[in-house]
């Protein structure tokens, strides 16, 4: 078993604290700032060095950078350029021996909660979701059928690259698992839908 924690570029104190309690592995979020070139091996090496110098071994990238990836999930203009960069990310993961990419296919609206301060036991607070409290931020619309088609196209291109560079693909379910948020469809909301995605487009290990 590998005990890992989730880290961002800014969380330098967090990874040092994690190391002190026995965490040796990291699930990393890639920088999305303008000065970081997602396709540059030099930039990747400098980013990863910060974790390695603290004794954290990168083992997972999660998620794909949303500025690029949502273009693919939603099938927007610029999709082909985004796919080129996403393939480069997978290739760089192979080069730097990061074995797993955790991705999702939540289009336009990602992980969502309607409350950030839901009362739990002992006075603790947690997050919560109630569909009646959801208010769309805009009028963007996409159907489940469109998302399935975009997902199929994405996997058709990304799986061969992942196989070539020996990068495993992990698929995160939609969270919350509801049929739609406003006019934005959700698809990975059940065991059956996840099985459809895995058996249809992801090559067996």
Please give the residue ranges for each predicted region.
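Acidic/histidine-rich catalytic cores of soluble enzymes
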Residues: 135-205
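N-terminal ordered "arm"
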Residues: 12-35
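Hydrophobic faces of well-ordered beta-strands that scaffold small-molecule active sites
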Residues: 1-5, 24-28, 58-63, 101-103, ...
């Amino acid at each position: 078993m590998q005990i890992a924690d989730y880290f961002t570029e800014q969380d330098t104190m967090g990874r040092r604290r994690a190391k002190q309690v026995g965490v040796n592995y990291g699930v990393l979020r890639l920088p999305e700032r303008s000065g970081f070139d997602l396709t540059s091996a030099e930039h990747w090496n400098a980013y990863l060095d910060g974790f390695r110098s603290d004794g954290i071994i990168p083992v997972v990238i999660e998620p794909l950078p949303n500025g690029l990836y949502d273009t693919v999930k939603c099938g927007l203009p610029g999709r082909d350029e985004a796919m080129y960069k996403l393939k480069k990310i997978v290739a760089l993961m192979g080069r730097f021996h990061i074995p797993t990419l955790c991705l999702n296919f939540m289009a336009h609206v990602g992980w969502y909660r309607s409350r950030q301060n839901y009362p739990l036991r002992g006075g603790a607070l947690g997050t919560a979701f109630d569909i009646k409290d959801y208010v769309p931020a805009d009028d963007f619309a996409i159907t489940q059928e469109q998302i399935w088609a975009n997902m199929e196209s994405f996997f058709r291109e990304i799986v061969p690259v992942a196989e070539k560079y020996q990068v495993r693909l992990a698929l995160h379910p939609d969270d919350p698992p509801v049929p739609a948020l406003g006019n934005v469809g959700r698809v990975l909301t059940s065991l059956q839908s996840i099985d459809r995605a895995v058996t249809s487009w992801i090559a067996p290990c």
